[in-house]
Amino acid sequence: MEEGYMIVNGSDVYYKTMGEGEPLLVIHGGPVLDHSYFLPHFERLAKDYQLIFYDQRACGKSSIEIDSATMNLAGFVDDIEQIRQKLGHEKLNVYGHSWGGLIAMKYAIAYDDKVDHLILSNSMAPSAVDWQKENLEAAKNINAADQRRLDVIVSTGLLRSANAVPYIKEMMLLSFKSQMFDARNINKLNLFIPEDFQQRSAVFGLLGPDLGTYDLYADLSKIKSPTLVLFGQSEAAVNLHAQKMTKALPNSRLEVIKNSGHFPFIENPTEFDKSVRSFLNQ
């Protein structure tokens, strides 16, 4: 295993590699989360691939000092390209989860010739409209007791208190709990919340204009790389836009992982690993 920092777009970006074999860049979700929730689950894949994790700009162990003019989707894409160049890989297999799937799509649109295989796992929708529809459906899965607790956390100022980190983590876990096929699996999700989470969230607020109106559907035709679209059985996207998204990608296939939700690598690791390995080996 190797870990450290590299200067990317003038900012310190934390990265970690493990395993040997073809490189697989792993793009985490969020925004404002980091790579750590993939572990230890992804260590299984390190037996056959070189996994490249990194904390996105202003996330996790990466620097919060970012040029505000580049705090947009294009900036996240450029970060990946610089990471690829600095690590010396001609091409990358790219795995994007959730919010990371949106970044992965944007990267593949811009740098399709640098992508060997693309995996869009539980990805944000390719358009703001579809993303908003999915969020509305997903919100219906939060049970009444958890919703009451979320309301308390948000309405009583706990998120703005000096000791906000435990409440931020609790809020996220309650939200992600509703996105599990089996709510008990939330105990297997490891989240790291930095002490300066609020400041990092404020930096991500600069993404507002990009996330409010984006629509990638027309540009998905530019992605010629083999693409695997993965969703969990209980995700709203399966019945909303999964088919539409797959049809917009010229060289893609859709797989739905049974008995899983937004985190199939946690809930159904056997089927998840089988799908990923089979796809990358084709």
Feature locations, PLM:
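Short beta-strand/loop motif that positions the catalytic acidic residue
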Residues: 223, 229-231
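Conserved hydrolase catalytic core segment
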Residues: 90-133
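Catalytic active-site module of serine/aspartate enzymes centered on a nucleophile-bearing elbow/loop
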Residues: 252-282
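Flexible "cap/lid" loop of the alpha/beta hydrolase fold
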Residues: 118-158
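Conserved alpha/beta-hydrolase "acid-adjacent" motif
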Residues: 236-241
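Conserved alpha/beta-hydrolase catalytic His-Asp/Glu region
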Residues: 154-205, 209-210, 219
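Active-site loop/oxyanion-hole signature of alpha/beta-hydrolase fold enzymes
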Residues: 53-99, 274
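Conserved HGGG/HGGXW glycine-rich cap/lid loop of the alpha/beta-hydrolase fold
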Residues: 5-65, 69
